[in-house]
UniProtKB/Swiss-Prot annotation:
One of its GO terms (cellular component) is cytoplasm. Keywords: Cytoplasm, Lipopolysaccharide biosynthesis, Transferase. Pfam families: DAHP_synth_1. The lineage of its organism: Bacteria, Pseudomonadati, Pseudomonadota, Gammaproteobacteria, Pseudomonadales. It comes from Pseudomonas syringae pv. syringae (strain B728a). InterPro entries: Aldolase_TIM (IPR013785), DAHP1/KDSA (IPR006218), KDO8P_synthase (IPR006269). This is 2-dehydro-3-deoxyphosphooctonate aldolase. The gene is kdsA. Its EC number is 2.5.1.55.
Length: 281
């Protein structure tokens, strides 16, 4: 089965290519922290030879509580992203929540992201597709892997085939997510690259009184399980002080653990992709 290659500048994203990393922080907490986090990611990924795209959100529009921190907003967020790109010369990805944001974000970011909760919103999907930008499509927690075909078709019908799929877990009762490893094989039938968002797969939605809980201690175990499935790469969030992060701290990797964490996953990715394909159907 031929696998499509999506090119982000000089980076090739495909299920049969070396793993890429879409990594950063959950939300832009401040300009200085964003610069600190990106600098560490760049240092580590350059050392390990992992192609890298910086990730953060300018607005978290689906927080549990009305009092939760959402981010700096569109205008200030784009200013921070522009400075990061100038300083570190890295591609950028961020999420879009409303149709009118799509074109603005696509002018600054190399990849625009369709949030999981919004992935069936046709007006948003079409607006994003019409920008011509690469789109990272998060699989909704309530969708089966095969249902992602409908979202891909919406984008294709709007004239955009620069698409990446991203697994982030499925709802399993209340306040819990699980990852069905069989889903990766189903989505590979669509031939687009697949990333694994290990951070949000560890989330426990609504698990705390006014925000999501998480299972940071299991991030390496779950990341290894995902990378073993011959994927295009990993989607990861890290934080200098996860216990005091403004969003999804319980899921975030400690920033000072980034190098040993990625070193193991790179080695695993190389091993898995060195094996010949065995057809078992």
């Amino acid at each position: 089965m031929a696998q499509k290659i999506i090119r982000v500048g000089s980076i090739e994203v495909a299920n049969d290519k070396p793993m890429v990393l879409f990594g950063g922080m959950n939300v832009l907490e401040s300009r200085d922290m964003a610069m600190q986090v990106c600098e560490e990611y760049v240092k580590v990924t350059e050392k390990l030879g992992i192609p890298y795209v910086f990730k953060a959100s300018f607005d978290k529009a689906n927080r549990s509580s009305v009092n939760s921190y959402r981010g700096p907003g569109l205008e200030e967020g784009m200013r921070i992203f522009e400075e990061i790109k100038r300083t570190f010369n890295v591609p950028l990805i961020t999420d879009v929540h409303e149709p009118h944001q799509a074109a603005v974000v696509a002018e600054v970011c190399d990849i625009i992201q369709l949030p999981a909760f919004l992935s069936r919103q046709t007006d948003l999907v079409v607006a994003m597709a019409k920008t011509g930008a690469i789109i990272n499509i998060k699989k909704a927690q309530f969708l089966a892997p095969q249902e992602m075909k409908h979202i891909l078709t919406k984008c294709e019908e709007a004239g955009n085939d620069q698409l990446i799929l991203c697994e982030r877990g499925s709802s399993f009762g209340y306040n819990n997510l699980v990852v069905d490893m069989l889903g990766f094989g189903i989505m590979k039938q669509f031939e687009y690259p697949i990333l694994f968002d290990v951070t949000h797969a560890l989330q426990m939605p609504g698990g705390r009184s006014d925000s999501a809980g998480g299972r940071r201690a299991q991030v390496l175990d779950l990341a290894k399980a995902g990378i073993s499935q011959n994927l295009a790469g990993l989607f990861l969030e890290a934080h200098p002080d996860p216990d005091n992060a403004k969003c999804d701290g319980p899921c975030a990797l400690r920033l000072d653990k980034l190098e040993p964490f990625l070193a193991q996953l790179k080695s695993l990715d190389e091993l898995v992709k060195s094996f010949p394909i065995v057809e078992t159907a």
